[in-house]
Each structure stands twice: as structure tokens, then as C-alpha cells.
């Protein structure tokens, strides 16, 4: 049986695509997992994948700090190599981030194929530095193709969990009514700035007849301060596929994973890029969706309540039965999301891995 080591760690943007690939191959392949201690993978990776954690970090800084980081990278690579040898691994799959560097180096050390998947339009530092040493590089968005030196990336899209690809019911706790459903998502790390923007606009939208589901993330001190029968605030939900499939409009950060989930659900979106994202990659991700007419971009530094509120009102004008609404822009946005979607990304990646295993 072919043995695959997955190296994915940190945020949902790295973990969820890797989990989708693991689910796609586990009937035919034996899957193991390597991550970093005290990160999200310790909660999300199923026990059957036998998570092994190694200490890995970034390569920022200069002088002594850089030397210490290089030493830690070497030690992490040795640990991953040990896991490869112990489990007789045939191939490595990684989604970037801190754990990707030792995984790529260890795979090269052991002379086994390694596939790197980059979800973002602007590749991360590890992808830019080490993509040339991988057996294959796959990308989620076309804009990344010319930004990975020394490689010829394959466009596969970004994998999503299987529940996004099959019809899901609307969660029973969603407010009932005839008004349009607006779903707000801050991502796996939450979004304080986005929450503030949304809360400034929500009272008016509720007054006009919207139903609102707001997933705030863990670090939100103001949850449930606003009470309304058509508003539900939760820190997290494991029923996001059902929410997005039934939503009329979503407000979201512009992580590549979130955009991929919106796309396969054909959910029109207002994207608010995280302004501190590395290399402004969320801005570039949002631009890819907006170029297809699938999304509208609102920036966090813009006057918060008027811009976001007016954008949502314009997009929902027909459903809110506003008298000056002429046509429904949501239909065209759904078509844009459908054009952006890659519904078989995990199968494409599984096939790519299979071609590389001798």
C-alpha cells in the first residue's frame, strides 16, 4: 500500500485543503501527518492519521536569530526524515507554511517525491524559496503561476472538504423568515476588524429585513451584545457548507481556502482582505475573484459602516425589495463563482501524486 506523509500546519487555509486530499486518497493510501506543536492541527487532524509534531518556524530575522532559525530548520528536517524512514513513506504532500520547509528538505534527503500546493495568488516565502526543489508544484489560483521561480506550476484549484461538494441542509438554528440570508465569516483565526465593520452595519440591515448569521471567531469580546430575533452570533460552526449553500450573500476575509469554499457553493461575496496578511496575499486573492465578477472588495481602512452597508444594500436590493432596484447582481456573481470553482482539486492532486510514485 502506498504511504503518504502530509505536512500541513497552522491555519485552516493550510489544514483544510490537506485534509481534503487525505480524505480523497485514504482508501488506497496509508496517510501519516506531520505538524507543529500547539497549533490547529492538534485539534483537527483525525487520530487515524497519526499526527507527529516537530518544532518548525519561520526564516525571518538576521544575524544570530537567523542562525538559530536555520539550526531549528535542520533539526526539524532530521525529525521529518526520521518519520519518513520509520513509516516507509513513498511521497510527501505539503500545503506550505512553516512545516513545509523541513518536509521538502527531508523528502529530497530521502529521494522521494514531494508535491507542494500553494493556495494563494501571491505565494508564501517557503513556496518561493523551495518550490524549485519539489517534484511538482500545484496552485489554487492562476495568478500564482509566474510567482514561483524555477518551477512549472500545475493549476488544480484548492481542495475543499467533501461536505462542501454535496447538498447540505440549512442548519436548524438559522433565523427563519423570508428575508435574504447574510452569512459573515472571519476565518479560522477570527477577525476583530471585520467584526467591528459588520456590527456597524448589521442594525440597519436587520431593520430592512435581512437575516444575519455572524461567525465571529474565538477572540471576540462583544459577541451577543446585540440581540435580535433575526441575528445569530456564534464563535464557530461546523455547518458552514450548509450555511454557504443557502446564503444569498457572504461577507468574508479573502483567504484562499474561504474563497474556494465560497466558489464551490456559488455564494456571492463581499471580500474584506486582511490588511496585515503577508505580502498582501489576501488582496491578490480577492482581486482574482473580483475579476470574474464573483465578489466585491471592501477595504478595512475605508469608512467602515457606510461603505460596507451601502455595498450589501446594493447587492441585496432586489431581495430587500428596494424601490430603486432594477436588476439582481447576485445572479451574475454566482456565475462568476461557478467559473472560479474547481470541484475536483483533491482528485487532481491525488492523480498528480500517483504519477510521481514509482
From Swiss-Prot:
Presence of keyword Transferase: yes
Primary location recorded for the protein, binned into one broad class: membrane
Chain sites annotated for binding UDP-N-acetyl-alpha-D-glucosamine: 11-13, 120, 161, 188, 282
Superkingdom of this protein's organism: Bacteria
Enzyme class: transferase
Nucleotide-binding listed as a keyword: no
Membrane spanning residue stretches: none
CDD domains: GT28_MurG
Protein keywords: Cell cycle, Cell division, Cell inner membrane, Cell membrane, Cell shape, Cell wall biogenesis/degradation, Glycosyltransferase, Membrane, Peptidoglycan synthesis, Transferase
GO BP of this protein: carbohydrate metabolic process; cell division; cell wall organization; lipid glycosylation; peptidoglycan biosynthetic process; regulation of cell shape
GO cellular component, one term: plasma membrane
Molecular function terms from GO: UDP-N-acetyl-D-glucosamine:N-acetylmuramoyl-L-alanyl-D-glutamyl-meso-2,6-diaminopimelyl-D-alanyl-D-alanine-diphosphoundecaprenol 4-beta-N-acetylglucosaminlytransferase activity; undecaprenyldiphospho-muramoylpentapeptide beta-N-acetylglucosaminyltransferase activity
Family as reported in the entry's similarity comment: Belongs to the glycosyltransferase 28 family. MurG subfamily.
Function according to Swiss-Prot or TrEMBL: Cell wall formation. Catalyzes the transfer of a GlcNAc subunit on undecaprenyl-pyrophosphoryl-MurNAc-pentapeptide (lipid intermediate I) to form undecaprenyl-pyrophosphoryl-MurNAc-(pentapeptide)GlcNAc (lipid intermediate II).
Record-given protein name: UDP-N-acetylglucosamine--N-acetylmuramyl-(pentapeptide) pyrophosphoryl-undecaprenol N-acetylglucosamine transferase
Organism: Synechococcus sp. (strain CC9605)
Organism lineage string: Bacteria, Bacillati, Cyanobacteriota, Cyanophyceae, Synechococcales
